[in-house]
């Protein structure tokens, strides 16, 4: 599908419905668990996509309805990252109060595709093109505390981090 020269789109994130999550600063706290949460996330994703179609966007996103924040949903697919025992860090790009971040505790290695199923579900909701937002190496570095590599360049350039399926 050919996009117009200037495509109307959204940054990716879309407001989560109050029945799905309570939003606290830049994090969502989901109201459900297990199968009920997945069903609610599917519903919220479909709602987000259909709303984007209705308002006339050309390039749609899944609305990031499955994410508690920008990086944790993606990082859950990698070994070497502790999402359970966060530590407080001042995040440079946000220039704000210190906040809890995941810890890098070992070699980062992809154990499973991070967003393939999310993309498949989103694509099944529309005939329009879908984009998926993923954090790059610098966002991951800034949004985690490195307790393993001790070197931001080494962490960013680790080949196993770039093990992305083609």
How would you label these PLM feature ranges?
Residues 1-166:
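Domain-level signal for soluble alpha/beta catalytic cores
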């Amino acid at each position: 599908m050919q996009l117009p020269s200037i495509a109307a789109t959204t940054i990716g994130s879309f407001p989560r419905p109050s029945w799905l999550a309570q939003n606290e600063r830049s994090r969502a706290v989901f109201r459900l668990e297990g199968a009920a949460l997945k069903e609610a996330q599917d519903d919220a994703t479909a709602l987000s996509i259909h709303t984007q179609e209705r308002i006339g966007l050309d390039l749609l996103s899944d609305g990031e309805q499955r994410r508690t924040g920008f990086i944790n949903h993606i990082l859950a697919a990698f070994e070497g990252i502790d999402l359970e025992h966060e530590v407080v860090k001042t995040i440079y790009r946000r220039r704000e109060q210190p906040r809890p971040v995941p810890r890098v505790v070992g070699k980062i290695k992809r154990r499973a595709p991070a967003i393939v199923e999310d993309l498949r579900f989103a694509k099944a909701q529309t005939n329009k093109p879908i984009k998926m937002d993923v954090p790059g190496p610098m966002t991951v570095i800034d949004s985690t505390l490195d307790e393993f590599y001790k070197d931001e360049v080494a962490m960013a350039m680790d080949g196993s981090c770039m093990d992305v399926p083609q």
